[in-house]
A protein has these predicted regions:
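Extreme N-terminal leader/targeting segments of oxidoreductases
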Residues: 1-22, 40-41
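Dinucleotide-binding Rossmann-like beta1-alpha1 core, especially the glycine-rich loop
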Residues: 64-146, 173
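N-terminal Rossmann-like FAD-binding beta1-loop-alpha1 element of flavoenzymes
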Residues: 20-47
Length: 458
C-alpha cells in the first residue's frame, strides 16, 4: 500500500513502499524532469532514451571546435519553473542576463522593434495600424480565459482586432513563416500563448527585453540533471530506441528495444515521446486513443547552426516577413551568449518550421545549405561565405503540436485505458507554446495527475 503525503508545493506524493519499477521513455527535458521528481520521492526509475545522449530538443552537439545547443533556447525572466530548476541544480550563479533587441526584415529592409519609440516609428505601418497592432498585443497579454480562444481561428481573431491591413502586412507573413499553411486551422490560443510569454518578459524595469542563458548552454543543465539522477539511483539507458511497450497477463509491462534482443520489465510506464512514436510502440492502446493521438498535427523543424567569424546583426531575433526568405527567423545567439564561450566567434541559428511531411526533410544538407547561405548573402551585404567556420543541420519531424480549434477538448487522458500506462508529452501543452519552461511545467503538473491515479488504484 502506498502512503500519501503532501509536498511543500501542495502536490501529491506517494512513497514507493510496494517497490514498483517505473520506466520513463524519452530523455528530453520533460522526461528528465519527471525522472528527477519521481526519484526524489523514492521511486525506482529507469529513464530510456533512443539517442546516444540525453536532452532531446535541448541536446548538444559539436559545431566546429565548440560544443553547444543543437537548437536555439533562451530563458525569460518569467520562466519560473525553469529558473527554479536551475536554482535547484545549484546553477543560479552561472545564469547570465542580457538586454536584447528585436529586428524585422520586411520589403528587403531591416527595422528595429525593440522599444516603444522604435515601434511608433516603424515605417511599414501607419499610425492607426500601429495602434491596432499594439492594442492587439496588449489585449492578448491580459486575456485569462484562454479556452475561448480555442473556438476561433488565429486568422479570424487577428483580423478582428488588428485589422486586415496589419494582418496582411505583419501577422500573416509571420504565421506562414512559423506554421506554413497550417496557420489557417490554428486556434487563436496560439498567438495568445506566444504574446503573453513575451509580454511577461518585458514587465520589469523599463520594458526592456532581458533574456538569459546558463554558462555552457544546455550542456551544463543536462549534465547537472544527469548527475543528480545518478545520485538518486536512477538507471539511465541511452542509445535504446523503444520498439514495443506491452502489458502482460502478470500485470507487468515488457519494454523492447529496436537494437537489443533483450527486454526489460516494469510495473508502470510513462511515455514522453511524440504521438507518432507512442502510437506505433504502445500496442495496447485502444483504437479510439490511437485515433485521438493521430489527429494531432505536428510541426517539424529544419534548423541550421552556423559558426561565423563575425556577427550578422545586433538583433537576437530577426522576424522575417518577405515570403522569398527560406527561413522562419534569424537568431543571432551571440547577442546573448558571450563570444568567449564560442572561441571568439558568432553563433547563428536559421530555423525553418514545417509540417512533418514537408519536402524539405528530403532535401540534402547541401541543398538546404545553399538555399540558406544564398538568402543570407541577399539579406546581409557584408556577409560572405568565407565567414562560415562551421555549418550543421538538425532535422526533427515531430517538434510542436499545432493547437487547432477546440484542441484541449480533443486530447485523450494522460492516464490511458491501459492501467499503469501514462502519456505525458508536449502535445499536452495547452497554456503556452513549446519551450523548455513549458516542458518542465507539463512534467511537474502531470506528475500530480499520475500519482493521484496511482493512489486511487490502491
Amino acid at each position: 500500500m502506498n502512503a500519501q503525503t503532501l509536498s511543500q508545493s501542495g502536490s501529491t506524493t506517494i512513497s514507493n513502499s510496494d517497490n514498483k519499477k517505473w520506466a520513463i521513455v524519452g530523455g528530453g527535458m520533460l522526461g528528465l524532469t519527471l525522472a528527477m521528481r519521481m526519484a526524489k520521492q523514492g521511486h525506482d526509475v529507469t529513464l530510456i532514451e533512443a539517442a546516444p545522449v540525453l536532452g532531446g530538443l535541448a541536446s548538444v552537439w559539436n559545431l566546429g571546435d565548440i560544443v553547444w545547443d543543437r537548437h536555439y533556447h533562451v530563458t525569460l525572466l518569467s520562466d519560473s519553473r525553469l529558473r527554479n530548476l536551475i536554482s535547484e541544480l545549484g546553477l543560479e550563479d552561472k545564469m547570465k542576463w542580457v538586454e536584447t533587441k528585436t529586428g524585422f526584415y520586411t520589403d528587403g529592409k531591416f527595422y528595429s522593434m525593440s522599444d516603444t519609440k522604435e515601434f511608433l516609428s516603424f515605417p511599414p505601418l501607419n499610425l492607426i495600424e500601429k495602434l491596432r497592432l499594439g492594442g492587439t498585443i496588449f489585449y492578448a497579454s491580459k486575456i485569462k480565459n484562454w479556452k475561448r480562444l480555442e473556438k476561433i481561428t488565429v486568422e479570424k481573431w487577428l483580423r478582428r482586432w488588428s485589422g486586415n491591413s496589419v494582418f496582411e502586412k505583419i501577422w500573416e507573413p509571420l504565421l506562414k513563416c512559423k506554421l506554413g499553411e497550417a496557420y489557417r486551422k490554428t486556434a487563436a490560443s496560439f498567438i495568445w500563448a506566444h504574446t503573453s510569454r513575451m509580454y511577461k518578459a518585458r514587465r520589469t524595469g523599463l520594458k526592456k527585453e532581458m533574456f538569459g542563458y546558463v554558462e555552457g548552454g544546455y550542456r551544463t543543465i543536462i549534465e547537472s540533471m544527469e548527475q543528480e539522477l545518478k545520485s538518486l539511483g536512477v538507471t539511465i539507458k541511452t542509445g535504446c530506441p523503444t520498439s514495443k511497450v506491452e502489458k502482460g497477463s502478470d500485470g507487468q509491462f515488457t519494454v523492447e528495444y529496436a537494437n537489443e534482443e533483450s527486454a526489460d520489465k516494469f510495473d508502470r510506464v510513462i511515455m514522453t515521446t511524440p504521438n507518432a512514436i507512442l502510437e506505433r510502440v504502445c500496442t495496447d492502446l485502444s483504437a479510439q486513443e490511437k485515433q485521438k493521438f493521430s489527429n494531432v498535427n505536428y510541426l517539424g523543424i529544419v534548423c541550421a547552426s552556423l559558426l561565423l567569424k563575425k556577427p550578422l546583426s545586433v538583433y537576437y531575433v530577426t522576424n522575417l516577413t518577405d515570403d522569398w526568405v527560406p527561413m522562419t527567423a534569424v537568431i543571432e545567439m551571440t547577442t546573448i551568449v558571450d563570444p568567449k564561450e564560442l572561441g571568439g566567434n558568432s553563433l547563428v541559428y536559421l530555423p525553418k518550421y514545417i509540417p512533418a511531411e514537408h519536402e524539405m526533410f528530403d532535401k540534402t544538407d547541401d541543398e538546404v545549405k545553399e538555399s540558406f547561405l544564398a538568402a543570407l548573402e541577399r539579406m546581409y551585404p557584408d556577409f560572405t561565405r568565407d565567414d562560415v567556420l562551421a555549418f550543421e543541420i538538425s532535422r526533427v519531424r515531430n517538434v510542436m503540436a499545432i493547437p487547432t480549434l477546440r484542441y484541449s477538448e480533443s486530447l485523450p487522458e494522460m492516464n490511458t485505458s491501459v492501467d499503469g500506462l501514462y502519456i505525458v508529452n508536449s502535445s499536452y501543452i495547452l497554456k503556452g507554446n513549446l519551450n523548455v519552461n513549458e516542458s518542465i511545467t507539463i512534467a511537474e503538473d502531470a506528475l500530480d495527475t499520475v500519482l493521484k491515479t496511482e493512489l486511487q488504484a490502491t
